[in-house]
C-alpha cells in the first residue's frame, strides 16, 4: 500500500499535474462553450432552459399540447414573415399563396404585424428550429408505448415470414425474438419529457474524450516516461519490491488518478450544462431522454449518470493501459507517444469502415474506441452477429474490456519486470559546416523567440484558420423590416442634402391611402378591418418612420454635418449587437495567454533574465 501512495504522490503531490489538469478542464470548458454558443442554426442555451421551466409544472399530455401549439404558431409566423419578405422584394404570385393559406393568415397575421408573439430566442427562424426540435423529441418519447408494441408486433409478424424461417444461419429470426424478449418487461415505464439538450451534451461531447486521452498521456509521462528517461527507473527496479509490486502500484495509481480526471472533466460538463441548459429532473426514467430511449435498464437519469461514469472509467482504463505500455516500452519518448496514439487511431478506422449491420460488426465494436462510446453501450440496444447467433453489444464490449485489460496489464507488468528499460542515449549531431552569423536586433530576436521558440506562430495560424472557418460558415437572416430599411438608407446614404429630403417626401406619397384610412378608422367612419388590406404597407411604413425619427430627426440634429450610412452591417461587424464581442474578447485573451505564457518563463528558468 505504501508503494501505491508513493506513486499517487508523484501525480498529485506536486503542482505539475494538478495545474495541467486545471488547464485541460479549462480547455474542455472553453471548447464546450464554443460548441454550444448560439449561432444562426443553434438556439441559445437560455431558450432551452426557459422552455424547460415552462414545461416543469405540466403533465405529459399538457407538455404535448403546449409544444404542438407553439410549433404551429411559430411555423405560421415564419411562413407569414417569408410572405412579407417576398413581397418586399417585389415577388409575384403571392396572392394565390395568401388565398390558399387564408386560415393561417386570419389566425396569425395580426399577431405577426403587431409583434405580440413571445420568443425564447432572438428571431422567428431560430425559434422555429427550437420548437421543431423539441416537438420532435417529445413525439419520440411520447410514442414509447407504441415503440414497445411495435417491437412485439414486428416479432410476431416477421417470425411467420418464410424469408426469415428459411435463413441459413437463423440469425435474423433469433435477433427479432431476442429483442422482443428484452423489451417485454418495460411496458410500465413512466415517461416524463424534458428537453435533452443539456444532459446529452454533457455526456456526449466528443472533445472531452480527446482531452481525456491527453490526460492519459500526462499520467504516463509522470508515472513512467520521466523515470525511464532520467535513469531513475533502473534504480527503482533494483530495490526490493521495485519490479512487480511497483508495476502494480503504478497501474493502481493510474486507474485511481483516471477516476479523478473523469470526475473533473464530466463534472465540468454537467455543471456548465446544468447552469446553461438545465439537466432536468434526475428522478425521471432514462427512457424519457429521446436519445437514450432504447435503453433496456429500468433506471433513472441519476442512476444512469453513475453507471455512465463507471463504464467510461472502465473503457478509459483499458485505453490507458495501452498508453502506459507504449510509453514504457518505447526507447524514446516521441516513439512512445506515436505508438500510444497509433493504435486508437487504427481502431477508429476499423470502427468507421465496418457497417453496423455487417456480419463483421463484432470487430467493429470489440475495440478500444468503442469502449469509450458509453452512450452507445448503455443507452441503446443492439445485437451483433456471432457465428449465426445474436449476442448483445454489452456482452461483447465487457468481454473485450476484460480481455484487453488483462492482456495489457500482464504485458505492462512483464515488460516492467523483465525488460532492461535503460534510458536512451542522447543524440549528438555534428554538422560538417558552420552557420554564418548575421547581425540582428532586439526586436527581431524577441520576435523570433515569441513566434518560433515559444510557438506563437502555431497558435496564430490556428486562430486564423478558426476565424476563416467562422466567417465562411456564418449565416445572417434579413427580414422584411430590414429589407425596407436598407432600401431607404441606401438611397439617402452620404451627406444630407435637399435631394435626399425631396426623395423621402416623395416616398411618403405611397402611404397616403393607408394614412387616410387610419384617420377614417379613428373617426369611426370605417371598421378596423379596413386596415387589413394595408398590412404589408404598414410594415414598410414602420421602416420609413424609423429612418425619419432615428436617423433624420434625432441623429442629424445631435450630429450636425454627419453623413448618413446604412449601418446594420457595421454594427454586426464591430459587435455592437449580440454577444459576439464577448466571445472575441475571450478568444483574444486566450490567444495572448498562449502566445506570451512562456516568453519570460523560459528566460527566467535558464537564468537569462539576469544576463539580459
Question: Across the structure, where does each feature detected by a protein language model lie?
Answer:
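Juxtamembrane non-transmembrane "cap" segments at the membrane-aqueous interface
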Residues: 278-285, 355-374, 425-430
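Alpha-helical transmembrane segments of multi-pass membrane transporters/translocases
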Residues: 17, 24-26, 31-32, 314-323, ...
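Membrane-proximal extracellular/periplasmic loop immediately following the first transmembrane helix
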Residues: 38-157, 475-551
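Membrane-helix interface segments
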Residues: 16, 242-243, 332-337
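Secretory targeting signals
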Residues: 24-77, 83, 154-227, 248-328, ...
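Helix-loop-helix units of permease transmembrane domains in multi-pass membrane transporters
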Residues: 3-12, 221-260, 442-446, 597-612
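Transmembrane helix segments
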Residues: 34-37, 333-366
Amino acid at each position: 500500500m505504501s508503494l501505491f501512495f508513493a506513486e499517487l504522490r508523484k501525480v498529485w503531490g506536486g503542482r505539475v499535474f494538478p495545474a495541467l489538469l486545471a488547464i485541460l478542464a479549462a480547455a474542455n470548458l472553453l471548447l464546450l462553450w464554443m460548441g454550444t454558443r448560439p449561432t444562426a442554426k443553434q438556439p441559445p442555451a437560455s431558450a432551452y432552459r426557459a422552455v424547460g421551466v415552462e414545461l416543469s409544472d405540466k403533465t405529459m399530455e399538457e407538455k404535448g399540447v403546449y409544444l404542438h401549439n407553439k410549433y404551429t404558431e411559430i411555423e405560421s409566423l415564419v411562413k407569414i414573415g417569408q410572405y412579407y419578405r417576398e413581397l418586399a422584394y417585389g415577388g409575384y404570385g403571392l396572392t394565390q399563396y395568401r388565398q390558399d393559406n387564408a386560415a393561417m393568415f386570419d389566425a396569425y397575421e395580426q399577431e405577426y404585424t403587431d409583434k405580440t408573439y413571445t420568443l425564447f430566442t432572438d428571431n422567428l427562424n431560430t425559434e422555429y428550429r427550437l420548437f421543431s426540435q423539441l416537438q420532435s423529441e417529445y413525439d419520440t418519447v411520447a410514442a414509447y408505448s407504441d415503440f414497445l408494441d411495435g417491437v412485439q408486433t414486428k416479432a410476431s409478424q416477421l417470425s411467420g415470414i418464410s424469408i426469415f424461417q428459411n435463413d441459413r444461419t437463423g440469425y435474423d429470426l433469433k435477433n427479432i425474438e431476442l429483442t422482443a424478449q428484452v423489451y417485454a418487461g418495460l411496458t410500465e415505464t413512466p415517461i416524463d419529457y424534458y428537453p435533452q439538450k443539456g444532459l446529452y451534451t454533457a455526456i456526449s461531447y466528443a472533445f472531452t474524450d480527446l482531452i481525456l486521452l491527453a490526460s492519459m498521456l500526462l499520467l504516463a509521462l509522470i508515472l513512467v516516461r520521466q523515470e525511464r528517461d532520467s535513469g531513475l527507473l533502473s534504480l527503482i527496479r533494483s530495490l526490493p519490491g521495485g519490479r512487480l509490486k511497483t508495476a502494480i502500484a503504478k497501474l493502481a495509481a493510474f486507474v485511481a488518478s483516471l477516476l479523478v480526471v473523469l470526475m473533473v472533466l464530466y463534472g465540468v460538463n454537467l455543471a456548465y450544462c446544468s447552469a446553461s441548459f438545465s439537466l432536468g429532473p434526475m428522478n425521471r426514467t432514462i427512457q424519457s431522454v429521446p436519445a437514450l430511449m432504447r435503453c433496456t435498464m429500468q433506471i433513472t437519469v441519476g442512476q444512469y449518470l453513475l453507471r455512465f461514469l463507471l463504464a467510461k472509467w472502465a473503457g478509459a482504463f483499458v485505453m490507458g493501459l495501452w498508453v502506459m505500455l507504449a510509453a514504457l516500452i518505447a526507447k524514446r519518448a516521441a516513439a512512445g507517444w506515436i505508438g500510444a496514439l497509433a493504435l486508437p487511431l487504427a481502431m477508429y478506422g476499423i470502427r468507421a469502415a465496418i457497417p453496423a449491420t455487417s456480419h463483421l460488426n463484432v470487430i467493429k465494436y470489440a475495440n478500444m474506441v468503442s469502449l469509450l462510446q458509453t452512450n452507445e453501450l448503455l443507452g441503446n440496444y443492439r445485437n451483433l452477429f456471432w457465428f449465426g447467433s445474436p449476442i448483445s453489444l454489452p456482452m461483447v464490449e465487457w468481454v473485450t474490456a476484460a480481455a484487453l485489460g488483462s492482456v495489457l496489464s500482464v504485458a505492462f507488468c512483464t515488460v516492467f519486470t523483465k525488460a532492461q528499460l535503460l534510458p536512451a542515449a542522447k543524440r549528438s549531431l555534428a554538422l560538417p559546416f558552420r552557420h554564418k552569423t548575421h547581425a540582428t536586433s532586439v526586436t527581431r530576436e524577441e520576435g523570433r523567440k515569441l513566434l518560433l521558440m515559444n510557438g506563437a506562430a502555431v497558435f496564430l495560424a490556428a486562430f486564423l484558420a478558426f476565424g476563416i472557418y467562422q466567417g465562411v460558415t456564418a449565416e445572417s437572416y434579413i427580414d422584411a423590416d430590414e429589407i425596407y430599411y436598407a432600401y431607404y438608407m441606401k438611397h439617402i446614404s452620404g451627406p444630407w442634402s435637399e435631394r435626399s429630403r425631396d426623395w423621402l417626401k416623395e416616398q411618403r406619397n405611397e402611404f397616403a391611402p393607408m394614412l387616410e384610412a387610419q384617420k377614417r378608422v379613428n373617426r369611426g367612419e370605417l371598421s378596423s378591418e379596413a386596415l387589413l388590406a394595408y398590412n404589408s404597407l404598414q410594415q414598410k411604413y414602420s421602416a420609413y418612420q424609423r429612418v425619419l425619427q432615428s436617423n433624420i430627426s434625432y441623429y442629424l440634429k445631435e450630429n450636425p454635418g454627419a453623413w448618413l450610412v446604412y449601418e446594420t452591417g457595421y454594427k454586426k461587424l464591430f459587435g455592437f449587437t449580440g454577444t459576439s464581442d464577448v466571445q472575441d474578447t475571450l478568444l483574444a485573451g486566450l490567444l495572448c495567454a498562449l502566445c506570451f505564457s512562456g516568453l519570460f518563463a523560459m528566460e527566467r528558468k535558464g537564468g537569462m533574465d539576469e544576463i539580459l
